[in-house]
Regions:
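Conserved donor-binding/catalytic core segment of Leloir-type glycosyltransferases
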Residues: 37-53, 59-62, 75
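Aromatic "clamp/platform" in nucleotide-sugar-dependent glycosyltransferases that forms part
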Residues: 122
Length: 223
């Protein structure tokens, strides 16, 4: 901006806002609806099935998690290249639920019954899914790619640094496994992170906050 002579003081950054879809539904009834047992710990990925979303690293990490917590289930909600998922997950496929592309109502139900949200993207301009997870009080494990690093702070989740190589970007699978296991081992801390995430959503990313910030910015132009 300095190269173009732009006055930084005249720039306002307004984060996108999302409508609050957290309905506090009966989680026991929802688990029955989705054929999930009450004992299973649900780890949730929501998004496009593409390598840029880090799904292969997630499946590898989940395999490690199962060695410690066999009562876990990975729900992968979305659509895209199923082949790359099936190939990597063939030995643990009974522990993974592929929902296909969900409408908003069904996706919000899945958010309500999940225990941990995972956003392992290798690149993400803005963390819509992370915000949705925070909206539903999920502790989030996310990478440090630019969009996610801004949205998810240390109070509402755990971060995974990306490894930048000459021709690729990678995630440390063992570290991702350890972060998930940590949240499973510390449910009270995980719950607090979820509550912090909910507050962060309400304070920064709720649609009403977006509206207020937009009006304030427009009004400032005429002062």
């Amino acid at each position: 901006m300095r190269n173009y002579g732009i006055d930084i003081a005249k720039i306002s950054v307004i984060p996108n806002g999302l409508q609050d879809m957290s309905d506090r539904l009966d989680s026991i009834a929802l688990r029955k609806k989705w054929n999930l047992s009450a004992e299973e710990k649900i780890i949730l990925f929501a998004g496009r099935f593409d390598e840029i979303k880090g799904i292969l690293f997630l499946i590898k990490a989940f395999r490690n998690v199962l060695k410690i917590y066999s009562n876990c289930r990975l729900i992968m909600a979305g659509s895209g290249n199923y082949d790359i998922c099936f190939q990597e997950a063939k030995d643990i496929c009974t522990k993974i639920t592929f929902t296909g592309l969900l409408n908003k109502k069904d996706l919000n139900e899945i958010y309500q019954i999940a225990d941990i949200g995972i956003v392992p993207s290798l690149f993400e301009p803005f963390g819509y899914v992370a915000i949705e997870m925070m909206m539903h009080e999920l502790p989030v494990v996310a990478t440090t790619t630019s969009g996610l690093n801004e949205v998810v702070n240390n109070a509402c989740g755990l971060k995974i640094p990306l490894t930048i190589l000459s021709e690729s970007v990678e995630i440390d699978v063992m570290l991702l496994s350890e972060k998930i296991i940590y949240l499973l081992q510390h449910p009270i801390e995980a719950k607090l992170m979820g509550q912090n995430g909910r507050k962060r959503y309400l304070d920064n990313y709720a649609s009403e906050i977006f509206r207020i910030n937009m009006v304030k910015t427009y009004n400032s132009l005429f002062q």
